[in-house]
From Swiss-Prot:
Family recorded in the similarity comment: Belongs to the ferritin family. Prokaryotic subfamily.
Localization of this protein: Cytoplasm
Gene name tied to this protein: ftnA
The protein, known as: Bacterial non-heme ferritin
Any matching Pfam family: Ferritin
Induction context: Induced by iron. Repressed by PerR. Negatively regulated by Fur. In addition, is regulated in a PerR-independent way under metal-depleted conditions.
Length: 166
């Protein structure tokens, strides 16, 4: 059985994952508006991944005999000055998610809820990948700078991204 404190934190994180999906869709909308269809697809796939994460937490809460609680999702940032800004904001968002999962893990440890600790380890591993990916994209975009040909090629590369549930 999940403690009240842990259940509250899991519900918060589930809702935060859905907020992250909204934020990535807002980034996709910016990219589409600026005619960067490849980058838009990248962020759409990222949004799918966040929804999958939310669903994974939802399933876990229910599997533990508790109740998943959905809350209002606040509006994400919609104005960006550049593609680079969307990726920098993405990295900040992922760093916040990592911090949140560390906090969740600490609550589970305090509760000696070893099943939840095991469950959360998957997310912690995922966050290492997410932060590394965005740091790499930021580095590439910074190097590309104003080189429109390089940006075009990089957009095409990222536009090929798909998301497969694991």
């Amino acid at each position: 059985m999940l403690s009240k404190n842990l259940l509250e934190a899991l519900n918060d994180q589930m809702n935060h994952e859905y907020f992250a999906a909204h934020a990535y869709m807002a980034m996709a909308a910016y990219c589409d508006k600026e005619s960067y269809e490849g980058f838009a697809n990248f962020f759409i796939q990222q949004a799918k991944e966040e929804r999958f994460h939310g669903q994974k937490i939802y399933n876990y809460i229910n599997d533990r005999g508790a109740h998943a609680e959905f809350r209002a999702v606040s509006a994400p940032k919609i104005d960006f000055s550049s593609i680079l800004e969307t990726f920098k904001d993405s990295l900040s968002q992922e760093q916040e998610v990592t911090r949140r999962f560390y906090n969740l893990s600490e609550i589970a440890r305090q509760d000696k809820d070893y099943a939840t600790i095991s469950f959360l380890n998957w997310f912690l591993d995922e966050q290492v990948e997410e932060e590394s990916m965005f740091e790499t994209h930021i580095n590439y975009l910074t190097r590309i700078g104003d080189d429109s040909n390089a940006l075009y090629l990089y957009e095409k590369e990222l536009g090929a991204r798909t998301f497969d549930e694991e």
